Amino acid sequence: LVRLHILGDFPSVEYVAFWARMLNKFEFLNVYGYTARLSGTPIGDAILSLRSRRFMVRQSGQFNGDDMSALSFDDARSLPMVTAKKAIVCPTQIAKRDEYELAAKGIDTLTPNCGTCGLCWTTPKNIVFLTH
């Protein structure tokens, strides 16, 4: 499992094609991450065309569809998505709340870190981050 772009984003369509070649070459390679590249742009569309169970790259802030997006909780679209069960609040952040009670009293987190969770790279459901 490779987590892409902690400090950057996809710079080109050619770079997306590189990851397509790596996925074809290495059968057990899995990739996840986030991108600000939106659909309707060459890079965003290349990412969308590669998206699969082995290439779980979420688009940040674009909730046009029903899945594979990431959004901050302070965005007005996030609470309705969570309420309608179209999005999941990141389990490592469930107790970081403002006026909303997202966790049962006394629960700090549902899982201690991303490595013990895996929702970002195993579910197509939207993910909402309380702090991001």
Where do the language-model regions lie?
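Class I S-adenosyl-L-methionine
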Residues: 1-132
